[in-house]
């Protein structure tokens, strides 16, 4: 191949070194790169993200970095993650500014079990964008948000904006019904001067307030609410309050910036189409029913700022396969992961003291669970119907096991109590109901007799073996 001009060899060498240095930095190596095969191999080995929503070919390992749409951006073994000196670059998307990952490098290094990390974004112009698709005969929505200040509503069709004024991020203010000239796709843009929250109502008049036909009960509210397909939250939004996106069945994508500090009861309850969520830094609790019945939710990354997972927070998230519970979490409440059929493994972090009633009930695919020493009580039906659970180690800190805690866990080969120095209280003879005939309850050899004679444990005397 002919060259248009001759390049000075010194310039070429300097350029090649610069390229090689950049490749080495991206690849996380200091090795010399042979030309051309070494360059090619190093470039192909660099993990790149899901900018533009492209399909990822990154292989899943232990520490997984996800984009907001669920694309796997980068993945590392635990050893590789411990060796990281910087976090991977964030993906790029038109109209969005990457705010970083919802776990810091320090917090990732402190966690010693598999985990998921999520990308945080804010809109590049600070406006909140609501992407809608209106059907024929359904072109007159009203919009409701909670301004503490003013919110300018640009309907995305070139008409004069509406302005909402309020004094609270939990009190809904409504626009008049807006008349679109034709059905189709529109982007509503909200410009906030002050602060803004989203709110709704799970009662008979309820559901998300964000897009409806009427502020009162009306069957047409469902039609407009379900025209919302994507939301990109901008600056000045601090609260996603009760039922904010309740039963927004068609909502499939949302970006939540790190300025949001509250996600409260029923916030995303019934968002059947949503597939991925990143909980940003600053959020401290996941409230009751927050993601209940999000049937398609396969990926969720929870910031390390979260300390509590409330009642039924993820109940009925049938597609959820993995979740990282941050080290700071001290409470996992009743039904938190009830009917998470696809969940395969869970680590209960140190700091949690009780696994509440039905917390992991009917997690049919759950094969392994790690329980921290801080746990003192396993409550009623905590692991009821966990058919696939293969074995479980009960740490010495557990002093009480409640009724039906491990009922119908047919596949468990052994329960390991070998680290215990005393016999924990067993509240009921139903605790291990359905135990397989060849299952073992492994206890210290010195405690076998005491264990077999203890209240309710005597029912399982034939399963108790000393180790």
Descriptions of predicted regions:
Residues 31-41, 82, 103-122, 183-186, ...:
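Extracellular interaction modules
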Residues 1-57, 71:
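Short, low-complexity N-terminal tether/leader segments at secretion or assembly junctions of large
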Residues 51-58, 122-146, 193-233:
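Extracellular ectodomain segments of secreted/surface proteins
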Residues 168-182, 186:
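Residue-level recognition of secondary-structure-to-loop junctions
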Residues 68, 72-81, 106-109, 129-133, ...:
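Structural signature of tandem-repeat unit edges
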Residues 83-110, 195-199:
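Surface-exposed interfaces of beta-sheet-rich extracellular modules
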Residues 55-67, 91, 107-125, 431:
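Conserved "repeat-terminator" motif of extracellular CCP/Sushi domains
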């Amino acid at each position: 191949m002919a060259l248009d001009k001759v390049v000075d060899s010194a310039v070429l060498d300097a350029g090649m070194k610069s390229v090689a240095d950049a490749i080495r930095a991206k690849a996380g190596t200091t090795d010399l790169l042979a030309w051309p095969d070494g360059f090619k191999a190093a470039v192909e080995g660099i993990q790149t993200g899901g900018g533009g929503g492209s399909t990822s070919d990154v292989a899943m390992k232990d520490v997984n970095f996800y984009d907001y749409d669920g694309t796997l951006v980068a993945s590392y073994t635990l050893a590789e993650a411990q060796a990281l000196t910087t976090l991977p670059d964030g993906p790029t998307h038109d109209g969005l500014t990457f705010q970083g990952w919802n776990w810091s490098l320090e917090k990732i290094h402190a966690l010693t079990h598999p985990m998921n990390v999520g990308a945080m974004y804010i809109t590049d112009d600070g406006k909140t964008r609501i992407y809608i698709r209106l059907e024929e005969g359904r072109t007159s929505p009203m919009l409701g948000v909670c301004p503490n200040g003013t919110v300018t509503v640009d309907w995305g069709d070139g008409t004069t904006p509406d302005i909402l004024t309020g004094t609270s991020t939990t009190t809904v203010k409504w626009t008049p019904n807006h008349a679109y000239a034709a059905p189709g796709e529109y982007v509503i843009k909200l410009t906030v001067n002050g602060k803004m929250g989203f709110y709704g109502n799970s009662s008979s008049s309820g559901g998300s307030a964000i897009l409806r036909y009427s502020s009162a009960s009306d069957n047409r509210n469902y039609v407009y609410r379900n025209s919302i397909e994507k939301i990109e939250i901008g600056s000045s939004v601090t609260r996603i309050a009760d039922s904010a996106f309740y039963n927004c069945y068609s909502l499939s994508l949302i970006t939540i910036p790190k300025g949001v500090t509250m996600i409260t009861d029923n916030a995303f309850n019934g968002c059947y189409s949503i597939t991925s969520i990143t909980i940003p830094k600053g959020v401290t609790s996941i409230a009751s029913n927050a993601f209940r019945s999000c049937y398609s939710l396969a990926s969720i990354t929870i910031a390390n700022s979260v300390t509590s997972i409330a009642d039924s927070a993820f109940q009925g998230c049938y597609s959820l396969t993995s979740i990282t519970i941050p080290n700071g979490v001290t409470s996992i409440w009743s039904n938190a992961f009830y009917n998470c059929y696809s969940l395969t493994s869970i680590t209960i972090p140190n700091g949690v003291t009780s696994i509440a009633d039905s917390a992991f009930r009917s997690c049919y695919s759950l094969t392994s669970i790690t329980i921290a020493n801080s746990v003192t009580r396993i409550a009623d039906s905590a692991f009821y119907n966990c058919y696939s659970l293969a074995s479980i180690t009960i740490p010495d800190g557990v002093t009480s096991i409640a009724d039906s805690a491990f009922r119908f866990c047919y596949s468990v080969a052994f329960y390991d109590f070998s680290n215990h120095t005393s016999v924990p209280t067993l509240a009921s003879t139903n605790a291990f109901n359905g135990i397989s005939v060849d299952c073992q309850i492994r206890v210290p050899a010195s405690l076998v007799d005491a264990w077999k004679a203890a209240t309710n444990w005597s029912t399982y005397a034939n399963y108790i073996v000393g180790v």
